[in-house]
A protein has these predicted regions:
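Catalytic core of PPM/PP2C metal-dependent serine/threonine phosphatase domains
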Residues: 1-66, 72, 86, 151-158, ...
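Active-site metal-binding loops of divalent metal-dependent hydrolases
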Residues: 56, 105, 161
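Short gly/ser/thr-rich secondary-structure transition/capping motifs
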Residues: 31-32, 80-85, 145
């Protein structure tokens, strides 16, 4: 479904709207839903367009400002509300900006004391790594290492912990 929608070239909010209509039919009576953050990047304009269906907002490291911006746009989960609306936002990216996309399994991971890794800890880790000018792959490796260190040897994930780092060169 997603691939077919992406190939239409529609803006992110329209893609989420169409996916929601399809999900309502597929998930009807299942009491399930989907969260999704969708973005597309235009290398000519250096603009990242995005829409959000109640997913964790990615973290944008603005290299020039040395600060984090949460990429969020209003939107309801997919598959529950037929008339759900989604907003499309866009932001211009600059050289050395990085975007961290992540699932809730990353911030919901807990240690032996029951403490969650949480978004604040992820943001602090991401800022520290960005300031040290690591590559996107090094950042991923170091965040996963931090998660492993945090959870200890008895790591048990309740949910997937997935991440992608997009770096503009």
């Amino acid at each position: 479904m997603l691939r077919a929608e992406v190939l239409t070239g529609l803006p992110p909010d329209r893609i989420l709207h169409d996916l929601n209509q399809l999900a309502i039919n597929d998930l009807d009576q299942s009491h399930r839903f989907v969260t999704l953050f969708y973005s597309d990047y235009d290398p000519r304009t250096k603009k990242l367009r995005f829409a959000n269906a109640a997913h964790n907002p990615p973290l944008l490291w603005k290299s020039s400002d040395q600060k984090i911006v949460k990429l969020d746009a209003e939107g309801f989960v997919l598959g529950l509300q037929k008339d759900a609306e989604y907003n499309c936002s866009e932001i211009k990216l600059n050289e050395n900006d990085l975007v961290l996309y992540y699932t809730d399994g990353v911030i919901d991971t807990s240690n032996s004391l029951g403490e969650r890794f949480d978004e604040e800890r992820l943001i602090k880790t991401f800022i520290k790594l960005c300031k040290q000018s690591y590559t996107s792959q090094e950042i991923l490796n170091k965040i996963f290492k931090k998660l492993d260190d945090f959870t200890g040897q008895n790591r048990h994930l309740e949910d997937d912990a997935s991440m992608v780092v997009f770096q503009l060169k």
